[in-house]
Amino acid sequence: MKAEETSPEDILKLKFKTDLGLGARANIGMIVLSSDQTLELEFRTLLNFEGVALYHARIPNQMHITEKTLAKMETELPITASLLPDSFNFDVIGYGCTSGTTVIGEDHVTKAIRTAHPGIIVTNPLTACKAAFRALRVKRIAFLTPYEPSITKAMRNNLIEEGFEVPLTASFYESDDFVVGRITPNSILESVKKIGVRDDCDGVFVSCTNLRAASIIEPAEKYLGKPVTSSNHSLAWHLLRLAGILDNSENLGRLFNQVI
C-alpha cells in the first residue's frame, strides 16, 4: 500500500499510562552560559537523586569575560528563561553564572527570570554560596576565582557586605572563558590547599561555574579539615533544598549533609 493510501484504521491503536515523569520529586530548570563547558557534567553527579530532573537552556554570552560583557546577559535572561516550558512545572530555576549575578545583581536576575516564569523560586551561585556558608556556619572565607581583578573585587565586596570576612582572595587572572573551562582540577585543588590552609579562614569558596571544582571538594576538605564549596557545588545544593529535596550524600562534601 502506498503511503498516501494509509489511513488511521491501518494502525493499531494501543493503550498507555502516564506517570509523574523523570521529575517525580522535583523539576529543576537551569540557564547555562553558552560558553560553559562544565556545569552540565558536574550537575549529572551533584543532582543525581531519585526523582530529580534537570532541564536547561543556554543563554548567549561572549567568551571574553568582562563586567561589560556580563552585563549584556540581563536582557537575554527573560528570553532564555522562556525556553524552559511552563508545562514542566518547575520547582526552581537557577542562573548559572556567579560573575554575571555579581554584575547584574541578584534581585535583577530573579526579576528577569520571573518575567517568563512569574512567582518561580530563583537562585544563582552567588546567592547559593552565601546560603551554603551560613548553613555550614562559616564566616571567614578564603576566596578563589579565575576572573580579572575588577570582577573578583566586586564579588569579594558583595560577600563582605553580606557579613562575611574574606581574609584572602586569589585568582587565576583569566578572562577567556574557554581557557577557564580547561583549567585542570588538580590546579584548582592545589590552589585551594594553598589558600585554605591559613588559620584565619574557616572555609574556601571556588567561584565560577566553568571551573571543574566539584571533584576536588572531598579531597580538599580532607586535606584542610574545613568546608570547601564551589559555584556549581553550592548551586546544586541550593537548588535541591529549595525544591524540597533534603536527601543527604556521603560523597559530595560536608555541604550536602546540611539543610538551609
What are these regions (language model features)?
Residues 109-116, 120-177, 256-260:
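Conserved beta-alpha
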Residues 74-87, 187-201:
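Short, well-structured alpha-helical segments in soluble
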Residues 75-78, 82, 122-137, 233-245:
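Hydrophobic alpha-helical segments within soluble ligand-binding/sensing domains
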Residues 229-260:
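C-terminal functional extensions of proteins
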Residues 90-96, 142-144, 201-208:
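Periplasmic-binding protein-like
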Residues 80-127:
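Glycine/small-residue-rich loop that forms an oxyanion/phosphate-binding "nest" at active or ligand-binding sites
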Residues 189-221, 235-236:
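Hydrophobic alpha-helical
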Residues 2-80, 149-152, 156-184:
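N-terminal glycine-rich anion-binding loop in soluble enzyme alpha/beta folds
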